[in-house]
Every structure is written in C-alpha cells, then in structure tokens.
C-alpha cells in the first residue's frame, strides 16, 4: 500500500506502516535545535470530562487549524524548515497532506500523550495520518482496550509511521510516560484536511 514502508498487521483488518525518513531530510543537531525553538511558551488547553486540562507537552498546529477535545489549535504558517518534509510526505504517502501538528516532549518534565484516537473532523476521507519522530527514542503504543490488545513500536530518531484512516478509528495510540527517557523528542504529524 505505501511503498518503502513495512506493514505491521494489528488484527487481520488493520495495520500500521513503519519506515525511515530519507537521509537528505534528517535533522542534524542544529536543525533539531531550530525545530525545538519553535515550541510555544504555554501548554495547549483541552477539554476533558473533568474540565480544562493543560496538555503534558507543547503543541502547535501549522498549515491548518486542528480541532479536537472541544478546542481549536490555531495554525501558524508552515515554517520553511518543514517545507522539505511536507513535500516528501506528499510524494511518498498522500498528495493532499496539508497540515502539520508538532508535539514537543521534554523527558525531564515527564511529557507524554495518553491513549487517544486522532480527530478526523474536516479530514480528507480515508487519508492516512503520518507521524515523524525526531530526537530521543520513545515507545509508540497502539491499544484496543476492549480486546486487551497492545502493540509497541520503537519511535527512534527518523522513524516514520503511517497510520491508515481506519486504523486510527479502530486503535488508540499513545506515547506513554517514561522514567528512563530524559531527553527531548519532537513528533511531526501530517494530515490531509479538506480545503
């Protein structure tokens, strides 16, 4: 389905695809620092059943607004630093990718993201969700609580995950807390939203 990506079957009907960022797009130390410097000062606030909660990581949308958990993450223009990555993803995965959501994780601050399905509001139907992992290795976990199913995948520097639309609906995903991982990680998630 996605050339240059390895298929990982999850349940006979759904899969996750994993690959590597091409070497020409790898972020060196200076590039990583430039990307890290883009994180907002404040944490995004979302609505949870118990009330408003700050996300345990920094987050910013680029290109298109991202609506989820009762809030809007208002988009900024795509930084030139990310233009080559977006162009590659359009060519390698899906031509209508037009939005990026960055999450900045600081291990010293215990940053993580809990189990969730990505919001599909305003997304192009059946378009996959692409996540690029930069920096320190973390675990990318997929779960189906009703089936007590769990799959862990290492999210190393330069790892690219492609999650089909149907997989996102059927499986939750997360980057769990880690007492061992004290470094910094950036995830770049690309989606295709209707114009």
Predicted regions: what is each one?
Residues 1-195:
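Non-heme Fe(II) oxygenase metal-center motifs and adjacent flexible, charged/small-residue loops
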């Amino acid at each position: 389905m996605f050339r240059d990506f390895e298929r990982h079957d999850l349940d006979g009907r759904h899969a996750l695809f994993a690959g590597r960022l091409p070497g020409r797009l790898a972020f060196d130390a200076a590039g990583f620092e430039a990307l890290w410097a883009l994180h907002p000062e404040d944490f995004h606030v979302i609505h949870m059943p118990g009330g408003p909660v700050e996300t345990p990581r920094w987050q910013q949308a680029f290109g298109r607004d991202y609506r989820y958990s009762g809030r809007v993450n208002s988009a900024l223009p795509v930084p030139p630093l990310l233009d080559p990555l977006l162009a590659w993803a359009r060519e390698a995965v899906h031509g209508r990718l037009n939005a990026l959501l960055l999450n900045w994780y600081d291990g010293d601050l215990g940053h993580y993201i809990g189990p969730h399905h990505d919001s599909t509001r305003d997304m192009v139907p059946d378009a996959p969700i692409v996540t690029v992992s930069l920096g320190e290795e973390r675990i990318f976990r997929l779960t189906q609580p009703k089936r007590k199913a769990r799959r862990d995948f290492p999210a190393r520097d330069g790892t690219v995950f492609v999650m089909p639309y149907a997989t996102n609906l059927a499986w939750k995903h997360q980057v769990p807390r880690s007492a061992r991982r004290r470094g910094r990680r950036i995830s770049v998630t690309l989606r295709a939203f209707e114009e």
